[in-house]
C-alpha cells in the first residue's frame, strides 16, 4: 500500500517551516521528528510515553501550530517527538483526522476540515 504523504507547515509562534507529513490512522496523536524540534526549538509542555516499533519511550511534548496543505486555518498541537527523521517529519494522527473528512480513493487522497477548536 502506498504511503499517504503531503505538506504541512509547523510554527512555534515566531518561525514557520514546511515539512513532509505522513497520514497514519493507526496513530492516536500527531507527533513530530527531532528535526522539527531542532529547527523550531518550541516550548516544552509536559511529557507522554509513546510506543514505537522498538519499545515504549518517554517523550517531551511541545506547543506548536500546524497548517495543513490546502487549508488556511492553523491547528494548535501538543505533539511528542518520535525521534530521528525519515522521509517525513510529521505523523498526522487521529487527533486531527477525526475532525475532518478523510478520503482515499484509488490512490488519490483528500482531507477537508471545517474547523478545529
Please place each PLM-identified region on the residue numbering.
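Pepsin/retropepsin-fold aspartyl endopeptidases
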Residues: 1-117
Amino acid at each position: 500500500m502506498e504511503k499517504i504523504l503531503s505538506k504541512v507547515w509547523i510554527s512555534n509562534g515566531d518561525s514557520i517551516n514546511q515539512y513532509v507529513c505522513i497520514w497514519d490512522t493507526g496513530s492516536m496523536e500527531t507527533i513530530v521528528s527531532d528535526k522539527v524540534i531542532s529547527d523550531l526549538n518550541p516550548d516544552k509542555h509536559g511529557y507522554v510515553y509513546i510506543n514505537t516499533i522498538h519499545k515504549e519511550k518517554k517523550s517531551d511534548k511541545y506547543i506548536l501550530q500546524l497548517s495543513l496543505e490546502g487549508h488556511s486555518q492553523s491547528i494548535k498541537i501538543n505533539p511528542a517527538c518520535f525521534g530521528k527523521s525519515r522521509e517525513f517529519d510529521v505523523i498526522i494522527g487521529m487527533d486531527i483526522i477525526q475532525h475532518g473528512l478523510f478520503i482515499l480513493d484509488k490512490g488519490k487522497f483528500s482531507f477537508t476540515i471545517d474547523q478545529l477548536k
